[in-house]
Amino acid sequence: MTVDRNYIRNFSIVAHIDHGKSTLADRLIQMTGGLETREMKEQVLDSMDIERERGITIKAQTVRLHYKAKNGETYILNLIDTPGHVDFAYEVSRSLAACEGSLLVVDASQGVEAQTLANVYQAIDNSHELVVVLNKVDLPAAEPERVKEQIEDVIGIDTSEAVEISAKTGLGVSDVLEAIVTQLPSPRTGDVNKPLKAMLVDSWYDAYLGVIVLVRVIDGILKKGQIIRMMGTGAKYPVERVGVFTPKMIQVDELGPGEIGFITASIKEVADTRVGDTITEERCPCEEALPGFKPAQPVVFCGLFPIDAADFDDLRAAMGKLRLNDASFSFEVETSAALGFGFRCGFLGLLHLEIIQERLEREFNLDLIATAPSVVYRMNMHDGSVKELHNPADMPDIVKISSIEEPWIRATIMTPDNYLGSVLELCQERRGIQVSLSYVGTRAMVTYDLPLNEVVFDFYDRLKSISKGYASFDYQMRDYTEGDLVKMSILVNGESIDALSMLVHRTIAEKRGRSLCEKLKDLIPQHMFQIPIQAAIGGKIIARETIRALRKDVTAKCYGGDVTRKRKLLEKQKEGKKRMRQFGKVEIPQSAFIQALKMNK
């Protein structure tokens, strides 16, 4: 039996990191009896350890709550807990498209942050109704009235009916439930008699059930035994289970229009189920797919190598397992003269890269070296073709390239105005172009266009340190722009080190080359002969440092006597060193690479 859609509310919670989104979700689950008090734990919906520890949500989770409103009716509330971080922006947009309304949660002591803005605009793009919720009003530093003004100024939505709560203590949470029922709309469309049309909101891998697919039914009915087809990939599957999360998995007979639940259908890999795809019935398909579907594209690339070469097969198996659950993570085998066998991996952004690396190290006990992150460059060749470059070491011959394009982003930075000067200086230093600057109370909101290449190194860390942690940062991908980019190679004793080559803008090549040479000079141990360390662009050396040779005192055995005897011994030593330098190999310790690559970040 399907539920009357007038009694369904599908909503998500939009907030900046740490503004209390997952804690509010916990309280809603507790107050509607989704879990017993003894079963409650912090951040119920964040199932990965790393999500709980970093206090971030990575995968979208869902829960179905039954709420008896003050008017005596029982409503079904479907909450989709979305990721808040920019790397997962596409997952956020699909989760929002599955809902009709959002709770905008803002920390009453901190106010509007950059990611709040980005996610609010996405919610508005999906024509959501918004309920403003001010969280943490019990804190001594809370200023609800100031924050309400700020929300009206920056976002332009009415805050007269804003709900003031403390998700931690439970204060005011019942008012949030009432606001969801009275202020948010029910699903706008949906016809039981039309062919099945459902949106694939998210999917994850379960060792026993295979891939679990989170769906939002638009039209028709989804039930066990149907043969379904993914319209994006054309793959067909028989539905084995249909159910909902409360947040425990509970099987139901069917899901009707407006409902959100899960299905399993012997799907082997998450890569077969693309977020945003349309699911329909094979026997009687719907006419057109839902708009807005696009496969995830990696944005940042880096090499991951095991410190111990014997771990290579374990690393491959571990990456295969992670890919089961994360279709946006891609990898291929790569060899490096300096680091041995490893993988070239593609990620959605820097947080995604950190999370994958941390999960590999933590869940699979692997010790890894990550090479400097790089972005995807486009090479326009003289013969008219366009090549994508993921690894600077693979750059084609410069003579064949007519121009190089790099990806740019539009960054929104919110900072207290006393740090504004330092923030603007940092953006200028990174080749940024200012788009706008506005003030919201004592905070400044700056919009900059920046090359992604300059952001993937250490932009975020630098921004946090110059603003004492108060600035927040969010970005959207823009498009590719032509730039004066050159490949910088590092030569040690005349041999190029592939793991350290990088594409840089010509204006900062010398500065970056010099700092890297200085670092390597301190990291590579002395040999019996002198070692030059050089940074080069093509055949031109732009920076050089020299590691001096170890000196053995060959004249120690001579006492007094003729000076020519000493000179002869010194000349002989000089000849030997010359020969050694010609044939000797420089041993670069692994630790030097790790340190040098850290410096690169």
UniProtKB/Swiss-Prot annotation:
Protein family according to the UniProt entry: Belongs to the TRAFAC class translation factor GTPase superfamily. Classic translation factor GTPase family. LepA subfamily.
Keyword line: Cell inner membrane, Cell membrane, GTP-binding, Hydrolase, Membrane, Nucleotide-binding, Protein biosynthesis
Residue ranges of domain tr-type G in the record: 6-188
Recorded catalytic activity of this chain's protein: GTP + H2O = GDP + phosphate + H(+)
UniProt key word Nucleotide-binding: yes
Function field: Required for accurate and efficient protein synthesis under certain stress conditions. May act as a fidelity factor of the translation reaction, by catalyzing a one-codon backward translocation of tRNAs on improperly translocated ribosomes. Back-translocation proceeds from a post-translocation (POST) complex to a pre-translocation (PRE) complex, thus giving elongation factor G a second chance to translocate the tRNAs correctly. Binds to ribosomes in a GTP-dependent manner.
Location relative to the cell: Cell inner membrane
One of the protein's GO biological processes: positive regulation of translation
Protein name from the UniProt record: Elongation factor 4
NCBIfam families: lepA, small_GTP
Enzyme class name: hydrolase
EC numbers, comma separated: 3.6.5.n1
GO MF assignments: GTP binding; GTPase activity; guanosine tetraphosphate binding; ribosome binding; translation elongation factor activity
Bilayer disposition of the protein: Peripheral membrane protein
GO cellular component terms attached to this protein's record: plasma membrane
Taxonomic classification: Bacteria, Pseudomonadati, Pseudomonadota, Alphaproteobacteria, Hyphomicrobiales
Residues given in the record as GTP binding sites: D18, H19, G20, K21, S22, T23, N135, K136, V137, D138
